[in-house]
A protein has these predicted regions:
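Structural preference for solvent-exposed beta-strand-turn elements
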Residues: 1-381
Length: 381
């Protein structure tokens, strides 16, 4: 096997191929990247039985072949090569990588033992890449990081005729985003896919500037897969098995008690006042006709408070919220103002979830395509 490729193109391809590989694996062979020659250049692939990545690039191929090499090591080498064409060749069980005056010799891995890369050829729909990446970032923050309950470590994709919904929860909060969807299926049936949040987050970052992203869901050999394709790059992922909780029903249809606040001011005030708090403590937010007051009591008698402008509609309200959870929602709103709506429970002494949505101005509500529901901490009275 022998080829020559552009250094930047080759480095980016290797980096993409290994990005989703686990840091540690019980099977060393799964840490490799598979390089194969094609009629038009090269195909680079990786697979750990759960996630695969595959990309194609142009190259001048002198001798066809396929080889398996340590992925992360090759990625580090490719990123540090001098600005010159990459010359790649195999000599028995060794791989030689040259660029300019830099030379590297690596051992190849047993390519015949490498598993087959999954191929997804089902019907696909299209989403705008930038909007999809934004939606993934907005919703992904609410996904659980506790592997004890795998079903909530994912983001639920809900496919409709013209929209794609993304939903995530960690039991303490729920995030929902709707985006436009060009449904490529002939059946028109609604579909759902529960994708690991970590994988989906990396996919969003990778394909964020790709124009459009093709998404297809398929069932092969009793394995449910989802595939994302753009710019000659494809990522597949096994879906999480289990029933995602029906969290959409938690969102109220209408709320008459809410406050409108400048988003940046609320973020900065929350960051300042929370400085005195212990790690898991909550901040007290008091909403009145005069505005919003933030209060915190920390250890060693440390205290902090701050008041900012807020336009309140409805009755005065006091809630306690974990600052980081609130900041995650505020950071995802992407509007100058934010609306914080206060829901009710059957117990008048127990505040209901707080709903965060965008607000175009103090007087005009924004798009409801993104919603973030946050469960308040019960106040100790």
């Amino acid at each position: 096997m022998k080829f020559q490729a552009n250094r930047d193109v080759f480095s980016e391809a290797v980096s993409f191929a290994v990005k989703l590989l686990p840091q540690r694996t019980t099977l060393p062979i799964l840490s490799g990247v598979l390089i194969e020659t094609t009629d038009t250049g090269l195909q680079l692939s990786s697979f750990d039985y759960e996630v695969s990545a595959q990309t194609q690039i142009a190259a001048e191929v002198e001798e066809p072949g396929r080889v398996l090499v340590s992925g992360r090591l090759l990625a580090e080498i490719a990123a540090k090569l001098p600005n010159a064409p990459v010359q790649f060749s195999t000599e028995e069980s060794k791989i030689v990588v040259r660029a300019g005056s830099a030379n590297f010799t690596l051992l190849s891995m047993p390519v015949e033992e490498y598993p087959s890369i999954p191929q997804v050829d089902g019907e696909a729909g299209l989403v705008p890449a930038e909007e999809f990446a934004e939606a993934v970032a907005q919703v992904g923050v609410a996904a659980s990081r506790d592997d004890v309950t795998p079903v909530i470590t994912g983001v639920q994709l809900e496919v409709g005729n013209n929209t794609l919904g993304l939903v995530a929860t960690d039991r303490y909060r729920v995030a929902v985003r709707e985006i436009d969807w060009d449904n490529g299926t002939t059946s028109g049936e609604a579909q759902t896919a529960l994708v690991p949040a970590r994988t989906l987050t990396e996919i969003g970052k990778t394909f964020g500037h790709s124009g459009t992203v093709s998404i297809s869901i398929t069932n092969r050999d009793d394995r449910e897969l989802i595939a994302f394709t753009a710019d000659k790059k494809t990522v597949t992922s096994l879906l999480i098995k289990g029933n995602f909780p029906p969290v959409r029903r938690l969102f109220p249809e209408q709320v008459d008690n809410y406050a409108v606040i400048n988003t940046a001011e609320l973020i900065e005030a929350t960051r300042r006042v929370s400085l005195v708090l212990e790690r898991e403590a909550a901040l007290r937010y008091t909403f009145t006709a005069d505005g919003l007051t933030l209060e915190a009591i920390g250890s060693e008698q440390a205290q902090a408070s701050e008041s900012i402008d807020a336009l309140l509609t409805g009755q005065e309200t006091v809630v306690s919220l974990k600052p980081q959870f609130l900041l995650d929602g505020l950071g995802a709103v992407h509007s100058e103002f934010v609306r914080i709506s206060f829901t009710k429970t059957e117990n008048p002494n127990k505040p209901g979830p707080v709903l965060i949505t965008s607000q175009t101005s103090k007087d005009q509500s924004g798009s409801d395509s993104y919603k973030y529901l946050l469960q308040p901490n019960l106040l100790l009275r």
